[in-house]
Every structure is written in C-alpha cells, then in structure tokens.
Regions:
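Cross-family detector of peptidyl-prolyl cis-trans isomerase
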Residues: 1-165
C-alpha cells in the first residue's frame, strides 16, 4: 500500500507556474486572448479548437490542429470539438476552462492527475480524444503507463462559438 501511495505522488504535477492562474480545483490557466460576448453556461453546446501536449513527458503533441499530423498534411480539414457544457463527456478541466471563456478567446491550461483529469483506471472513457492513431498512442502511453512518469498535460483551447442545445 505504501508503494501505491508513492506511485500516486509521482504521477501528480510538482509545478505551480507563477504566470498561470490557479483555481481552487487545481486547474492552472493562462489567457492568450480574451474573446468577446457572453461566457457559455451549463447545458449549452460549445465548439472549440484544441491542441494537447504531454507536458510532463517530453512535451509531445498528441493533438495538433492545423499542423502536420503523423507525417500527413491534413490540417485543412477542420473538425472542431463539440459537446454540451457540463454533460460529463469530457474531462472536468475542459468544462471548467471553457465555462470561464468568451467566444474567440484562447486559453492554455495545465492539468494534473486529480478530479479534473482523465480517470486513471480508464482514461479512454472521457474525451477529449486525439483524432489520429499516433495521437492516441502518445496520449494513452502516458495515461496508461504504470511507471513513475509525470502525467501532466497541457492544452490550448480556442472557444469558437456557443450554441443553445
């Protein structure tokens, strides 16, 4: 049991970034562009563009919109991520981050294992999920790894628009 607790501590982030805002839930965020209009409310459909990186494990991208993916130049076909805010379809960090944004805004978030993270017992259960096989391999290698690697993730999120569901 002691070894399990030690493993848990090693998979959690050790860094609080001073130029990021830290929320009571543990989410760290930094706004690059504020956007305009009203912030989305629970129950509304949100449409976002996002990038994801394994910040705690060599900074490897696992989702990069508008960039070459796996050697294929497929950035022209944009499929945005859509979900109902507060529905539980995605990790809690996405709901919390987007709820505080305005359309057109860009926010960077740092997410560590905890209540806002992918479930460690079944990380494939919640999104966001990479759109490519190589992206899935990069993300799930980190999330499903039983070793002592830092599972911290970094996401860049752009709120494209908000719609009534």
């Amino acid at each position: 049991m002691r070894a399990f607790r030690a493993l848990r501590r090693c998979t959690q982030a050790k860094n609080i970034y001073p130029d990021f805002t830290l929320t009571p839930s543990g989410l760290q965020y930094k706004d690059f562009r504020e956007g305009s209009g009203a912030s989305p409310r629970k129950g509304q459909r949100v449409i976002v563009d996002w990038d994801g990186y394994t910040a705690g494990y060599y900074g490897r991208p696992f989702e990069a919109r508008n960039k070459a993916k796996g050697g294929a130049f497929t950035g022209d076909n944009k499929e945005y991520l859509r979900w109902i805010l507060g529905s539980g379809e995605l990790i809690g960090a996405f709901d919390e981050a987007v709820a505080g944004m305005k359309p057109g805004g860009i926010r960077r978030i740092i997410v560590s294992p905890g209540p806002l993270f992918y479930p460690l017992d079944n990380p494939r259960r919640l999104g966001p999920k990479p759109s490519t096989f190589s992206g899935e391999r990069a993300l799930y290698f980190v999330l499903e790894n039983q070793g002592l690697i830092d599972k911290t993730l970094l996401f860049d999120i752009e709120l494209i628009r908000v719609e009534n569901a």
